[in-house]
From Swiss-Prot:
It is found in: Cytoplasm, Cytoskeleton. GO terms for cellular component: cytoplasm; cytoskeleton. Transmembrane segments: none annotated. The lineage of its organism: Eukaryota, Metazoa, Chordata, Cephalochordata, Leptocardii. Its EC number is 3.6.4.-. Keywords: ATP-binding, Cytoplasm, Cytoskeleton, Hydrolase, Muscle protein, Nucleotide-binding. The keyword Chloroplast does not apply. PANTHER family: ACTIN. This is Actin, muscle. Pfam families: Actin (PF00022). Belongs to the actin family. It catalyses: ATP + H2O = ADP + phosphate + H(+). Its main location: cytoplasm.
């Protein structure tokens, strides 16, 4: 590795299903955070000289959402549309970070238990389209643990497209005990759209979904006792909040505030037959060796945007205490910066001097092809 490659600051790009978090290794927060959205006009452009584009990315797509059809290139943590994904990366490098990707090594993240082809294609695009000097793909949950300063713990990482529980002991992930749940922020938003429709508020288009997402983020919370909370909501107006829509209309939101997030603990609300997040964490711990369980119970790390609901830590504590053996000490760790903890972990990892030997170099890629990513990235 030549000297000038050593000096270039590595980039860290956490491509979530909902948000792209990107920045430079060594920083304590991502420089650029924008929605992982590509929007295409759904109407004919008639005014000349407007500089209309055939596609908009991120915040610009968000601000023009009234005339666009919005698509998310990443679904359930898996890239489903590579052309759009390239647009998102291009936007990240050239417009947001304003750097040349051929000069900086790039650390990317991905969800555990993703199809192998996904990371191969990522590697291929980085080296062939963007000419990266070096790159690396890391599992999101492992980075979250780095960010919390632990080497042992079970991470519940719940973003927009996928939730997963990853038990890690002394720095080793236990692949047999990793569980994945395709229930996360986007499903909750869709569920809230349905619930609001039952109330007579019609939210249908891709642009209106973004309004519902905002309602969810601003007003949603997790009830400690769901039945009790439903009673409270039915008998008093203390839980009601009002929200102003972009056109000035004001709507009131009552029990929808906590019914939405409750689906994390009761996926049957969404018509899913899977276990809730608390049971998934428990099942994941039970798949581990009996000797490591105690340490996992005491280090439950929450991360990702969907764990930002107020009250989720207390509810998680209550549910875990009910599932675990009675003498077990349970601790839920919910760091305030957990929305970005995966990115922060990547920033820490990429700036370690010992990590320099881990990068996949362009020369190695040219020799072995995309499959090298399975050899070098754990």
């Amino acid at each position: 590795m030549s000297d000038e490659e050593e000096e270039a600051t590595p980039l860290v790009c956490d491509n979530g299903s909902g948000l792209v978090k990107a920045g430079f290794a060594g920083d304590d927060a991502p420089r650029a955070v924008f929605p992982s959205i590509v929007g295409r006009p759904r109407h004919q452009g008639v005014m000349v000289g407007m500089g209309q584009k055939d596609a908009y990315v991120g915040d610009e797509a968000q601000s023009k959402r009234g005339i666009l059809t919005l698509k998310y290139p990443v679904e359930h943590g898996i890239v489903t549309n590579w052309d759009d994904m390239e647009k998102v990366w291009h936007h990240t490098f050239y417009n947001e970070l304003r750097i040349a990707p051929e000069e900086n090594p790039c650390l990317l993240t991905e969800a555990p238990l993703n199809p192998k082809a996904n990371r191969e294609k990522m590697t291929q695009i980085m080296f062939e389209t963007f000419n990266s000097p070096a790159m690396y793909v890391c599992i999101q949950a492992v980075l979250c643990l780095y960010a919390s300063g632990r080497t042992t713990g079970i991470v519940l990482d719940s973003g927009d497209g996928v939730s997963h529980t990853v038990p890690i002991y002394e720095g080793y992930a236990m692949p047999h005990a990793i569980l994945r749940l395709d229930l996360a922020g986007r499903e909750l938003t869709n569920y809230l759209m349905r619930v609001m429709c039952d109330r007579g508020y019609a939210f249908v288009t891709t642009a209106e979904r973004e309004i519902v997402r905002d309602i969810k983020e601003k007003l949603g919370y997790v009830a400690l006792d769901f039945e009790q909370e439903m009673l409270t909501a039915a008998t008093s107006t203390s839980l009601e909040k009002s929200y102003e829509l972009p056109d000035g209309q004001v709507i009131t939101i009552g029990n929808e505030r906590f019914r939405c997030a409750e689906a994390l603990f009761q996926p049957s609300f969404l018509g899913m037959e899977s276990a809730g997040v608390h049971e998934t964490v428990y099942n994941s711990i039970m798949k581990c060796d009996i000797d490591v369980r105690k340490d996992l119970y005491a280090n439950n790390v929450l991360s990702g945007g969907t764990t930002m609901f107020p009250g989720i830590g207390d509810r998680m504590q209550k549910e875990m205490v009910a599932l675990a053996p009675s003498t077990m000490k349970i601790k839920i760790i919910a760091p305030p910066e957990r929305k970005y903890s995966c990115w922060i972990g990547g920033s820490i990892l990429a700036s370690l001097s010992t990590f320099a030997s881990m990068w996949i170099k362009k020369s190695e890629y040219d020799e072995a092809g995309p499959a090298i990513v399975h050899r070098k990235c754990f």
